[in-house]
Regions:
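Beta/coil-rich, acidic/histidine-enriched accessory regions frequently appended to metallopeptidases
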Residues: 37-134
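Catalytic cores of extracellular degradative/oxidative enzymes
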Residues: 1-9, 18
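Loop/turn elements at helix/coil->beta-strand transitions in domains of secreted/extracellular proteins
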Residues: 10-17, 75-76
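Generic hydrophobic alpha-helical scaffold/packing signal
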Residues: 1-2, 22, 65, 69
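Short, flexible loop/turn segments with low-complexity composition
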Residues: 14-20, 81-84
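Long, well-ordered core segments of solenoidal/helical folds
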Residues: 19-36
Length: 134
């Protein structure tokens, strides 16, 4: 939520990412697969993810990685790795095929729930940064 608000430079749009991820998943589930798979960010997938017996079947983690990377136009693999979120080789290859700039691993620290004005972005690619609040 804070990431999307920062990306859009508008704290009021922060929660919109959840709606966009939901809509993206519905399009993946309901679209004419062959006609729309590339436009939805699944160009390397021969079949719709989740088809029974499909070797490239995805789970929720894969869908989140693909959807978030596609919507933000950033390679989100470092952040997923930071959080220990496992994704398949097929999803990793699809994100690599996008050719997007890598989003460094990050964490939004906050000492108040959902209070955007107090959020501090921590770059997690440099090890363990100090907690920014007293």
């Amino acid at each position: 939520m804070h990431y999307w608000a920062d990306l859009k430079n508008d704290p009021l749009q922060g929660w919109d990412i959840w709606t966009l991820l939901y809509l993206h998943q519905r399009q993946v589930d309901k679209s004419d697969w062959d006609a729309n798979k590339a436009a939805l960010g699944y160009g390397t997938y021969a079949q719709r993810p989740g088809n029974s017996g499909d070797a490239s079947s995805t789970d929720g983690n894969d869908n989140l990685l693909l959807g978030l990377s596609w919507l933000t136009q950033r390679d989100q693999r470092p952040t997923f790795a930071l959080w220990g979120i496992r994704t398949s080789a097929a999803a990793q290859a699809q994100v690599a095929a996008y050719g997007f700039a890598e989003q460094p691993a990050f964490f939004y620290a906050n000492n108040r729930t959902n209070e955007y004005s107090t959020v501090k972005l921590l770059d997690m690619s440099q090890g363990s940064p100090a907690w920014p609040f007293p």
